[in-house]
Regions:
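Conserved, single-site charged/polar hotspot
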Residues: 2-42, 46-47, 51, 56-67, ...
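Residues within well-ordered alpha-helices
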Residues: 77-80, 702
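The conserved cystathionine-beta-synthase
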Residues: 81-84, 101
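Serine/threonine-rich, repeat-prone extracellular segments and beta-strand-based repeat modules
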Residues: 94-98
Length: 742
């Protein structure tokens, strides 16, 4: 007779089976949990090497010292503290075998307080926006991850530890609310919020039907859901006139601090997040979104409209002045912040008299009629400068006062042309120079090099010489007849490099290690009546060429076409090494120190290299310019690239340059890097060279000679800048570059 099991027995068996499965799951989770996911109840041993790599031992060394399987125990932690010599400083509660995540990271924080004296490990709450293999995109940037990628889920928050650009540990999950600061809200349609953040558009459900469009806001998340939206609707509209890392100066308003999480959005031709490079001083009407007295976002509602350039006026190559006085023949309106004062015509305006105001604000000086110029004066009011069109701005810094001339671009170019070339050069050469000056100025306005001082450029050879010579009818006409014309290559306005005199051939983009795609218009060309088949990259061929005057070259009658000098570094070792170190500070990638002439091992300093033993040309390109120069010393060697570095360094050894016309001139820098160097056997070096300037782009004297050959300005420009075209500047210029998407 078959026995029938009772229902009670079946239930008992099912219960026992379920309990067994549960126990197995717990055991598996305890030993294999890292493969299945993040746990608050334990820390996995193989998390520890990444967390402790900032200490005396590397990540690999920690992996050897600690078992890497299973979960972390209090015994493990005790061993870690002993290895770190912290056991007597950090007490342990060893009541349980395994240590949970919160307890371990409390101990880890204490370890950091003792050992991480440089604060290299940072603690941060992140919100995961995107996960790709071993990389997380978060509200604050992109980080590599060392733990299991399965731990991280999109739109969840994590308390993490960061070392450089890596997440090295996870202390908690969904414990803190995290906000996307200064996101751009596009729309809220039927509870679906569309917003832009870090270059990526997101669409998420939101528990509200309120209007949320075209506004900047903080979006707070809690456990994967939006739980709060804080709109930021206070704005200031105006022009940006100076910018530092911490503040922006708005014309007619003053300085405003910058939120660390500030975003920039272009809202014309679609909505996109753009980089800081999109901002141009003076020439953009900008909407600044402000919250808690900080700029938290910038809205670019239209492209830049090029009107004015801001020129820092130097005082004998010094940007700072102990004091300065200006005057105009008409009443002057003086602006600072939102305040306006009118001064009588002829009033001497001295910066030190406004020191109290300048301590917190710039001061803008505007002629009442909008056209009368300003002049610098001495202490007695005597005029000591040419006339300056436009307005003036005064600022005060710990080093002294600065003066910025805000002037329309055409007036600026009119001030550049006579300062760069004589009006006798011929109209077509002057017009070519005007197009170059205008194009070059635009590029510098994009670069904003002097933005911290409220300027785009200065008035020296650092950029373009400005207002150092009086304008003439010819130079003014050259600017007027080319008004608004700039050179473009592949649709972009180009940087129109120019210089004084060629040696018969111009340089190309390779001389400065420039990108061929962007600077392909800088091709080396012969500046002579016909091509010459000589290979100028060959040392012997170059020496043969530079040793003679090539009469077929347009500039062969000019004194800088050929020159010679002697390099003598005896007694100048300290000066030479100091100059090398200075140039490396300015351009570190172009100069390299080696322990010896074999150049197999680098070193960080050249200060103990001793005296110079030899100079060698390592590489020369087809235009003839030296690409790499090697200087061998008693205790090391130096590799030098870039023509200006070579000219400055070798310039330490010269006194006079002997020119083609028989004259001699004192110089402290070589006229060009189109040179041949020959050791003389007595420790000195004979140098044969040609040309004056960097040699890249347009030769100004070459342009004059081409003008004399009947070339018009368009043909001159196409001669020196290959595959370019004239375009119109005074139309809206799109300066924006879209930020990389998440």
């Amino acid at each position: 007779m078959r026995k029938v099991k009772s229902k009670k027995s079946n239930y008992l068996l099912l219960f026992c089976g379920a309990l067994l499965v549960l126990i197995l799951v717990v055991l598996i989770t305890d030993t294999k949990g890292e493969k299945n996911g993040y746990s608050e109840q334990c820390v996995y041993r193989n998390e520890i090497p990444s967390l402790l790599q900032f200490t005396y031992y590397s990540r690999d060394e920690w992996a050897e010292k600690l078992p890497q399987q299973g979960t972390l125990t209090y015994d493990d932690v005790s061993g870690i503290l002993e290895l770190l010599h912290l056991k007597e400083y950090i007490p342990l509660d060893d009541s349980e075998k395994n240590i949970d995540r919160a307890a371990w990271f409390a101990i880890y924080d204490e370890i950091l307080s003792y050992l991480d004296t440089d604060t290299s490990v940072l603690k941060k709450d992140i919100l995961v926006l995107k996960k790709e293999k071993k990389q997380l995109t978060t509200q604050d940037g992109t980080y590599a991850i060392t733990s299991n990628p399965k731990w991280y889920q999109k739109l969840h928050s994590y308390g993490v530890y960061l070392l450089e650009d890596k997440v090295i540990g996870v202390a908690a999950k969904d414990k803190e609310d995290v906000a996307l600061k200064n996101a751009y809200l596009i729309s809220n349609i039927e509870g679906n919020l569309t917003f832009l953040y870090q270059g990526t558009e997101y669409q998420l459900p939101v528990d509200t039907d309120e209007e949320l469009s075209n506004v900047v806001a903080d979006i707070s998340f809690s456990e994967k859901e939006i739980h709060k939206i804080s709109r930021k609707e206070d704005t200031i509209t105006g022009k940006l006139i100076s910018k530092t890392d911490t503040a922006m100066e708005i014309k007619g308003y003053g300085q405003v601090a910058i939120d660390e999480a500030m975003k920039i959005y272009a809202t014309y031709d679609g909505i996109r997040e753009v980089s800081m490079d999109a901002l141009m001083l003076e020439n953009m009407e900008i909407t600044f979104v402000v919250a808690e007295k900080q700029i938290c976002a910038i809205l670019l509602t239209e492209p830049a409209k090029i009107e004015n350039i801001r020129v820092l006026l130097l005082d004998n190559d010094n940007m700072f002045r102990s004091d300065v006085s200006l005057v105009s023949d008409v009443p002057v309106h003086l602006y600072y912040g939102e305040t306006e004062t009118v001064l009588e015509a002829g009033s001497m305006i001295t910066a030190s008299n406004y020191a109290n105001i300048l301590a917190t604000s710039s001061v803008s000086l505007v002629a009442e009629d909008g056209i009368s110029p300003f002049y610098f004066t001495d202490n007695q009011g005597n005029r000591i400068s040419p006339a300056y069109a436009g307005s003036m701005e005064l600022r005060m810094y710990p080093e002294g006062y600065t003066v910025v001339n805000v002037v329309d671009l055409e007036s600026y170019v009119k001030g550049v042309i006579p300062s760069e070339v004589p009006s006798s050069y011929g109209m077509e050469a002057l017009k070519a120079q005007a197009v170059c000056a205008r194009s070059y100025a635009y590029i510098q306005m994009m670069h904003n090099k002097y933005e911290a001082y409220g300027a785009h450029v200065d008035d020296s050879v650092n950029f373009q010489v400005y207002n150092k010579q009086n304008q003439t009818p010819e130079t003014v006409a050259a600017v007027d007849e080319t008004k608004g014309q700039v050179l473009s290559y592949k649709g972009d306005i180009i940087e129109t490099y120019y210089y004084s005199t060629s040696y018969g051939h111009t340089g190309d983009y390779e001389a400065w290690n420039l990108d061929k795609d962007a600077y392909g218009y800088l091709q080396g060309v012969w500046v002579r009546s016909e091509e010459n088949p000589i290979d100028l990259s060959d040392e012997k061929s170059f020496l043969d060429y530079i040793s003679n005057v090539d009469s077929a070259c347009y500039e062969s009658d000019l004194k800088y076409f050929r020159w010679n000098t002697v390099l003598d570094f005896q007694g100048k070792d300290e000066t030479l090494l100091h100059t090398i170190a200075d140039r490396k500070e300015h351009q570190p990638e172009a100069i390299c120190y080696y322990k010896d002439a074999s150049k197999t091992e680098t070193t960080d300093s050249c200060s103990n290299f001793g005296s110079l033993q030899a100079i060698n040309v390592v590489k020369r390109n087809q235009s003839g310019v030296i690409l790499e120069l090697e200087l061998d010393f008693q205790n090391g060697a130096v590799s030098v690239q870039s023509e200006y570095n070579m000219r400055a360094i070798l310039g330490c050894g010269i006194t006079n340059i002997n020119l083609l016309d028989g004259s001699s001139v004192e110089m402290s820098i070589l006229p060009s890097a189109y040179i041949s160097i020959q050791a003389k056997g007595d420790g000195t070096y004979a140098v044969l060279g040609g040309g004056y300037g960097h040699g890249i782009g347009m030769s100004q004297n070459g342009a004059q000679k081409l003008c004399g050959q009947g070339f018009d300005y368009k043909r001159i420009l196409n001669y020196f800048y290959q595959d370019t075209e004239l375009t119109e500047l005074y139309q809206p210029q799109n300066t924006t570059k879209e930020e990389g998407g998440a």
